[in-house]
Amino acid sequence: MAALIIALPEEAEGIKGYPIYLSGCGKVNATIATMRAINDGHRFIINFGSAGSVSDITGLVEVTGYVDRDMDARALSCELGQTPFEDGIIIGEHGIVCGSGDKFATSKPEIACDIVDMEAYAIAKTCHKEGVKFRSWKYISDAADENSANDWEENVHKGNSLFQKMLYRGGLW
């Protein structure tokens, strides 16, 4: 059975029939929750949460690629987003790319991405390293701009019902 990793209780409200691991915000917390789920025997991880859009994307979207918007080792001749001594920047594929960072985004990040959050990259990387299947859906709650904090507070709960409709109709596998 798939396990869900969700940052906040309000994003998980009403979801039944799946083990839910509430991670809290940020990449370290997301990694800890992911390892707990994997150590509990889950071989398929689903992430749901809110995200800001730095493009024209709206609604509930499936993320196809993940980048770390905090990683900057250009002084070591790495590309922006590349972890030293590792190949590549993106986990997954181009399409809808999520840039994860430990700073709540109030402006477009320097690294190329379509949406921004605080957890998905860490979950994707952990699953990739551990050989666990992973998929992620994000509800666009704000435009990652100067109004994003207020917009996020107003909209964070709105994606839950859309995600549940998809989850229960079996469209995840």
Describe each PLM feature range.
Residues 5-9:
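Structural motif
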Residues 11-173:
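Glycine-rich phosphate- or other oxyanion-binding loops that anchor nucleotides, phosphorylated ligands
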Residues 1-3:
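Extreme N-terminal starter segment of soluble prokaryotic enzymes
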